[in-house]
Amino acid sequence: LSAYIDGVVGKGYTDANDVGNGKLEYMTNSRNWYHTLFVSGEGEYYIGHKWLFTAQADLHQHFVTNNDRRIISQDMNRKTIGYNHARTELSTSITAKWMPTERLGLSVTLREEMYGAQWTPLIPAFYADYLISKRGTIRAKASVSRNYRYPTLNDLYFQPGGNTDLVPESGFSYDGGISFAIGKEGVYSLHGEATWFDSYIDDWILWLPLGGNTNYWRPLNMKDVHAYGVELKAGYDRMLSKEWQLGLDGNFSWTPSVNRGEAFSKGDRSLGRQLPYVPVYSAAVTGRLAYKSWRLLYKWCYYSERFTMTSNAFTYTGNVPYYLMNDVTLEKLFSARWADLSVKAAVKNLFDEEYVSVLGRPMPGINFEIFLDIRPKWGKKKARD
């Protein structure tokens, strides 16, 4: 059984126009605060060496408060300046795993979730994996699962733009892949995998700019979305000595997400086109170097260009260019009798790239972060005694 309390997190969004003489006219001045209480429990039961049954339950209690100093016209009948909502979310699942042979594993999961007073349909999933070769640990995997996602509180109520008419996403996903792992214990390890996936989602929830005289976004349901692609992952770890360790991880994704549903209007040209702000290609490489209690991490990311409109028009405002991102982090670990501690310093956007992830909203240049992590050793001393 585990539990935690997530700290209060705040976000702000301000949009103002310069009307001259140093005066600003605020169009939007929104503040959003949320925190979460969480409890989780799980158990497992073996029957011989071939059957394993597991059960898990996760309970979240979300609290969200949003205020806007500007009065937002949500519809023609009322005006709101924010919202204050709480929602209980419960997720329960049971899984049966069976190994009929030494090389073959099969499992079935049944999951059901509650959002407020609404229960989802039963959500099944089936998984299979087969050890092709013990040499190189070459393994084939496949799965079929049902998808169901309820709108978040921000999807429903965020000011400005929340949409209380949203319906849940639903659909099916299929994937298959192959993986390998080789190495020598205490010296090095090398692993990799390739996965193909194919998803068909009804009522995909997508935030889109409203356009016209409005300056904010609103989530809408897209009737039918086909998301598919290939993901490649690889990792290498090396013990340089007793005190030095080196690690390298990389991934590449090709992930088209195409609208296959109904047009929103007569002039809608989104059918058969990539969803706005969803990159088709992305990649990341992370390097790690550890010496005693010191940790150095370097991360490089790539995101391909993204369209800003459902028409996928190649115009000045119809897409945002690709960008590269470089981050570096240095961390020092400490250990006390009562807690494990770490101090971390990070440099984000190391080369001060000029880029945007959303049209017209420049992202920060080089910036710096400092973290202090404290993990109390509650009960550990007693357990040793």
Task: Please give the residue ranges for each predicted region.
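Transmembrane beta-strands of outer-membrane beta-barrel pores
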Residues: 3-11, 59-65, 88-90, 110-116, ...
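Outer-membrane beta-barrel translocator domains and adjoining extracellular loop/strand segments
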Residues: 10-24, 66-74, 118-124, 153-159, ...
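C-terminal beta-signal and adjacent terminal beta-strands/loops
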Residues: 302-311, 321, 327-385
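Face-selective signature of the C-terminal outer-membrane beta-barrel domain
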Residues: 1-119, 127, 131, 193-196, ...
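Residues that define the transmembrane beta-barrel architecture of outer-membrane proteins
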Residues: 33-37, 84-90, 120-122, 170-174, ...
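Gram-negative outer-membrane beta-barrel transporters
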Residues: 99-104, 196-200, 221-308, 338-340, ...
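Short loop/turn motifs that connect adjacent beta-strands in outer-membrane beta-barrel proteins
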Residues: 46-52, 102-103, 133-138, 183-190, ...
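Membrane-embedded beta-barrel scaffold of Gram-negative outer-membrane proteins
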Residues: 2-14, 131-133, 139-141, 168-228, ...
